[in-house]
Amino acid sequence: MKTHLRRSIMASLMLAIATFVIVYAQEPKADEQMNKRGDHVMGFDHAKTTHLFLLRESGGSIEITANKSDDVESSKQIRMHLKHIAMMFADGNFNAPMLIHDQTPPGVPVMQELKGEIKYNFEEIDRGAAVRISTKNPTALKAIHEFLRFQIKEHKTGDSLDIG
């Protein structure tokens, strides 16, 4: 009886370890795939840029900058991409993040539904650009924050998940 119990425990432990190893081994591959899709959709090499996703009381912002001040091409591509994103999001079109992440990010359905309640302002910044997102609608605000928190986690930016 004790031998049977030990074997069951060992088998369960081995299955748990194997599952952990498989999931852990696939994580970098999932990140690599997301980054490849992102490079294709955004039109620039993510490794040459820095993404920031910031939560604010009225919404938040998406900021992307070239890592090197002399990387004029990346800065140009960032500006083109974020200008396009601001227009797409204002129209309720979130195809770009859905393609990059291979799923519908949290908050997107509500942001699409309440698109008339949300403003997306494009702004050029040093070495890149930003999209400032704002709303006075509490439901839209919650959705914006869900969307930005998802971006922070997916892109592993280390940005605060708190409203600043």
Where are the language model's segments positioned?
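Bacterial N-terminal signal peptides that target proteins for export
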Residues: 2-12
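Intrinsically disordered, low-complexity terminal tails/loops enriched in metal-binding residues
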Residues: 23-164
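Serine/threonine-rich, low-complexity intrinsically disordered segments
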Residues: 5, 21-24
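Bacterial N-terminal signal peptides
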Residues: 11-20
